[in-house]
């Protein structure tokens, strides 16, 4: 059984923080999950916590919740904020997620790269090998096709772009970006495409961003951030830290207005800062509510190309159906080769060498013609969901 358990949409950020996973514990999580499930993929982003699994045994929903909650040491009171989807619903969920239909900012395509990353990590961890691997391969192809054909780059959107565009409209020109992961890199790229006065990039390891040093960008470590934090107009924070990185005491009470966009989950910024008159603080939930002119265009365009999602769902479900009869097909081919070998051997003992070779080709081609037709019929019936009776007849003909 294929399934996914994750945080429900529109759950408050205060709850999502309690369900966030820490990357440093990833190996431990996977190892423990594989004690209960055949395959596992963990999708852990700033806005999404989902565990995709495949189990061979029949297992109740309560058992699934218990096993996963025990691994992550989540409080049972948080179960009401989680969803569980199985079989086709789980497949549909992944295909829609990778195309941006479930993103807090509709159409945001960062999720495609994040799912590709989760898939590659699962391959590296040896935590997928069959059904989940195929499902993610089809999903990634679906996401790429959707992105290309839908041409969402013509109406670009992300939490980063919305935050920075909002700040620029408010007159911000001096920026600080905390963190240089995927989101931080997007923030820097977006800022460099606009006329800003300066950018302070705050990182743990300055060597990882040394190529950015220039007239506009100055790279500092976290110990140096407070030297300039009260001089800037806007902070974009997007670290993976499990703790607060911008504290209430870091920003003075008096001074010019400072806009803070906290894109992290758990939150990077002390929420008490919003009580200071000079601070305008927005977390990821508030950022996703900022209306932008492209929202309606994105929604209409995505609906127009939703057939790509539906085709990918069908592709995977059809693969599963064919896979269910693959062992029967394999046995038929084995039996075909056995019968052909017996007939060829019998003829070879009676005929001359030249005739034997001709007979071998004729026997093999005749057998292939009938066996391949039977296999085509079995596959066709499997796709219709009516393969059991067909398989019974074919087995009686070829395997008894």
Curated annotation (Swiss-Prot):
This is Glutamyl-tRNA reductase. The lineage of its organism: Bacteria, Bacillati, Bacillota, Clostridia, Eubacteriales. One of its GO terms (molecular function) is NADP binding. PROSITE patterns: GLUTR. InterPro entries: 4pyrrol_synth_GluRdtase, 4pyrrol_synth_GluRdtase_dimer, 4pyrrol_synth_GluRdtase_N, GluRdtase_CS, GluRdtase_N_sf, NAD(P)-bd_dom_sf, Shikm_DH/Glu-tRNA_Rdtase. It comes from Clostridium perfringens (strain ATCC 13124 / DSM 756 / JCM 1290 / NCIMB 6125 / NCTC 8237 / Type A). The gene is hemA. It catalyses: (S)-4-amino-5-oxopentanoate + tRNA(Glu) + NADP(+) = L-glutamyl-tRNA(Glu) + NADPH + H(+). Catalyzes the NADPH-dependent reduction of glutamyl-tRNA(Glu) to glutamate 1-semialdehyde (GSA). Possesses an unusual extended V-shaped dimeric structure with each monomer consisting of three distinct domains arranged along a curved 'spinal' alpha-helix. The N-terminal catalytic domain specifically recognizes the glutamate moiety of the substrate. The second domain is the NADPH-binding domain, and the third C-terminal domain is responsible for dimerization.
């Amino acid at each position: 059984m294929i399934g996914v358990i994750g945080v429900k949409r529109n759950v408050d950020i205060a709850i999502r923080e309690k369900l966030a996973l820490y990357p440093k514990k990833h190996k431990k999580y996977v190892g423990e999950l594989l004690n209960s499930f055949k395959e596992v993929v963990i999708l852990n982003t700033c806005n999404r916590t989902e565990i995709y699994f495949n189990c061979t045994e029949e297992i109740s929903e309560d058992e699934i919740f218990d096993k996963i909650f025990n691994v992550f040491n989540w409080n049972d009171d948080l179960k009401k904020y989680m969803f569980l989807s199985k079989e086709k619903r789980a497949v549909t969920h992944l295909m829609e997620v990778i195309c941006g239909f479930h993103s807090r900012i509709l159409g945001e395509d960062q999720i495609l790269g994040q799912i590709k990353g989760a898939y590659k990590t699962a391959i590296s961890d040896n935590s997928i090998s069959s059904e989940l691997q195929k499902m993610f391969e089809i999903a990634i192809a679906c996401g790429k096709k959707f992105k290309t054909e839908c041409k969402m780059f013509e109406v670009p959107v992300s939490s980063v772009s919305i935050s920075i565009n909002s700040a620029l409209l408010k007159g911000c020109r001096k920026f600080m970006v905390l963190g240089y992961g995927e989101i931080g890199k997007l923030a820097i790229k977006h800022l460099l495409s606009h006329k800003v006065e300066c950018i302070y990039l705050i990182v743990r390891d300055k060597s990882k961003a040394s190529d950015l040093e220039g007239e506009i960008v100055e790279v500092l470590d976290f110990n140096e951030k407070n030297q300039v934090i009260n001089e800037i107009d806007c902070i974009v924070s997007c670290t993976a830290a499990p703790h607060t990185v911008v504290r209430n005491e870091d920003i003075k009470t008096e001074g010019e207005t400072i806009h803070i966009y906290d894109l992290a989950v758990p939150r990077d910024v002390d929420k008490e800062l919003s009580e200071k008159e000079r601070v305008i603080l927005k977390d990821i939930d508030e950022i996703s509510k900022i209306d932008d002119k492209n929202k309606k265009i994105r929604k209409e365009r995505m609906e127009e190309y939703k057939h790509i999602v539906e085709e990918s769902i069908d592709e995977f479900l059809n693969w599963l159906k064919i896979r269910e009869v693959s062992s029967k097909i394999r046995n038929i081919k084995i039996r075909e080769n056995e019968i052909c070998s017996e007939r060829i051997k019998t003829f070879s003992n009676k005929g001359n060498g030249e005739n034997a070779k001709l007979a071998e080709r004729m026997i093999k081609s005749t057998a292939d013609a009938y066996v391949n037709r039977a296999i085509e019929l079995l596959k066709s019936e499997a796709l219709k969901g009516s393969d059991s009776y067909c398989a019974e007849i074919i087995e009686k003909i070829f395997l008894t």
